Amino acid sequence: MARLALPGVGAYTARAVMAFAFELDAAVVDTNIARVYARHEGRRLTPREVQQLADTQVPSGDSWAWNQCLMDLGAVLCRPQSPGCAACPLAGTCAWRGAGADPAVGSAGVSRAQAPFEGSDRQARGRLLREL
């Protein structure tokens, strides 16, 4: 990933640019996607594990839609509190549904509190993406 050579651009930003700006096959793992994968697998996942799993599941030539759908699934149905399991398209294969303790808690960094936005790396990445 040559985009990683840019100062301040890490794996997530590089993958997001590849998938959303250039529509290249790249798995993007944000908080919502990490939660979906951890719950679906029914276990805690390290950041490396969730990225490797996501990399194996991106459909060739359709990563833009795939990543967007997973982000939306995590934001709208597979929410941190009160998930909408009854309406989830993955409910039939979800290892977590009704199994008890939520494996997403503490998994792949999905539970970390975020620092203030103003002056953050997130703000800088947003400015960089707008310029691309």
Where are these regions (language model features)?
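Catalytic cores of DNA base-excision repair glycosylases
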Residues: 1-123, 131
